């Protein structure tokens, strides 16, 4: 008799301004993730993470689900959902508790984190993530894992990421309208960090910048933990809008020429080649030179990168003022679809004045053989990161359930012994 093993599937869904993407991963016996399905569709009905046409975005979600189910030969029932919009905020908070036992236990950790998160957050906001940064015991600071240590008082610094509840609720409603359950909502910047950053980069200090169509996600790590996160409501579509306006052409044509001919900065490689915009009837509707196109693109990208640089500098000042590690030894990692434009790394280094690399999903512990070259460009960084995130959640949830079962079983035995003896 052949034993059929149930597949351990994880599904990630990103509903972006320009595209809706879904990925299906299978957790294999060797603990790697094998991507077995993918779905891609142009997004309609959402702008910068906020739904403006529920019916249209539901159709987009259904389309990518059908694509992924066909490719993976599976039935999708639940997903991990990426969130990115200008109403995502972060704050670092402190919790303090007395240490009552000889040694610090897991319960103490839970209590001090609970104290730190029990703060006033913005109206209509709900907490998405609670991320411990470091602990202090009496005068000892910078402790990463205090379990088993002794002391009188423990302090925790945690990073809280929040989202406007109605915006999150509407996106979940769109997913549930497709008959799909949302297992967990994840800030897109965290998901991209999971797929793109290395442990060494987080320890040295790094800032990941995920530039999509409508929003730019920023996450800053020092000493191995997340110190700051935010969303800037400007991204690749802002550049496309400029091209559309300057050359008086439809947005659709502007996006195509940005992808085909675009450079993020001037270069000797750029000639005075004439670009012709042709409509569906093969009629020329506009002509202009490539160097003029580059001029438009470069000015907007420099403006966006300057905004990002100001956010990074302000965060570093706050970290330095509080006596915490603030240097970004590993520099800046750029990812997302809008980072694919030629010479973007060079343009970014001119603004940031520190090392920059273009990040794409890591190849370790994940098999992307079924995917196209999109994985090499960073366009799928978030949706693949959701698979990494989902695997962690899968195991932690399973271990928690096992622990609760064992706890209930012990309680049952204790009650039985008391009753019988």
From Swiss-Prot:
Keyword vocabulary terms for this entry: Cell cycle, Cell division, Cell membrane, Membrane
Q: Where located?
A: Cell membrane
Q: What is this protein called?
A: Cell division protein FtsA
Domain of life here? Answer: Bacteria
Family as reported in the entry's similarity comment = Belongs to the FtsA/MreB family.
GO CC annotations, alphabetized: cell division site; cytoplasmic side of plasma membrane
An annotated GO BP: FtsZ-dependent cytokinesis
Role according to the record: Cell division protein that is involved in the assembly of the Z ring. May serve as a membrane anchor for the Z ring.
Oligomeric and partner information: Self-interacts. Interacts with FtsZ.
What is the taxonomic lineage of the source species?
Bacteria, Pseudomonadati, Pseudomonadota, Gammaproteobacteria, Enterobacterales
Major location category of this protein: membrane
Q: In what way does this protein cross or attach to the membrane?
A: Peripheral membrane protein
Mind telling me which Gene3D superfamilies this protein's record contains? Answer: 3.30.1490.110, 3.30.420.40
Q: Which Pfam families match?
A: FtsA, SHS2_FTSA
Q: Which NCBIfam families match?
A: ftsA, PRK09472.1
């Amino acid at each position: 008799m052949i034993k059929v093993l149930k597949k351990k599937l994880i599904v990630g869904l990103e509903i972006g301004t320009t595209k809706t993407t879904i990925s299906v991963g299978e957790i294999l016996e060797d603990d790697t993730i094998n991507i077995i399905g993918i779905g891609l569709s142009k997004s309609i009905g959402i702008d910068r993470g906020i739904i403006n046409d529920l019916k249209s975005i539901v159709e987009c979600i259904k389309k990518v689900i059908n694509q992924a189910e066909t490719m993976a030969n599976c039935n999708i029932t639940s997903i991990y959902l990426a969130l990115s919009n200008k109403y995502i905020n972060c704050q670092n908070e402190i919790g303090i508790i007395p240490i009552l036992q000889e040694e610090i236990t897991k319960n103490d950790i839970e209590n001090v984190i609970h104290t730190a998160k029990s703060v006033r957050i913005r109206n209509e906001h709900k907490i998405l993530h609670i991320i411990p940064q470091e602990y202090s015991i009496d005068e000892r600071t910078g402790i990463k894992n205090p379990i088993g240590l002794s002391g009188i008082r423990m302090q925790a610094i945690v990073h809280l990421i929040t989202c406007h509840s109605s915006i999150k609720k509407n996106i979940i409603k769109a997913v549930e309208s497709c008959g799909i359950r949302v297992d967990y909502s994840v800030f897109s910047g965290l998901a991209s960090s999971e797929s793109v950053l290395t442990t060494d980069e987080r320890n040295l200090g790094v800032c990941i910048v995920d530039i999509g169509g409508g929003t730019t996600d920023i996450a800053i790590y020092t000493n191995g933990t997340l110190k700051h996160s935010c969303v800037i409501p400007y991204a690749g579509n802002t550049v496309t809008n400029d091209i559309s306006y300057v050359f008086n052409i439809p947005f659709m044509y502007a996006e195509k020429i940005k992808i085909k001919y675009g450079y993020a900065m001037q270069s000797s490689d750029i000639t005075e080649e004439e670009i012709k915009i042709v409509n569906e009837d093969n009629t020329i509707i506009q002509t202009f030179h490539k160097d003029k196109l580059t001029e438009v693109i470069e000015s907007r990208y420099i403006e966006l990168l300057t905004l990002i640089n100001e956010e990074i500098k302000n965060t570093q000042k706050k970290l330095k003022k509080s006596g915490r590690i603030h240097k970004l030894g590993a520099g800046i990692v750029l990812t997302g679809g809008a980072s694919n434009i030629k010479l973007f790394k060079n343009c970014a280094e001119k603004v940031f004045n520190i090392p920059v690399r273009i990040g794409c999903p890591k190849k370790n512990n994940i098999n992307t053989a079924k995917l196209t070259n999109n994985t090499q460009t960073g366009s799928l960084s978030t949706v693949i990161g959701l698979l990494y995130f989902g695997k962690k959640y899968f195991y932690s949830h399973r271990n928690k359930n096992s622990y609760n079962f064992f706890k209930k079983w012990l309680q049952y035995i204790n009650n039985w012994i008391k009753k019988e003896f």
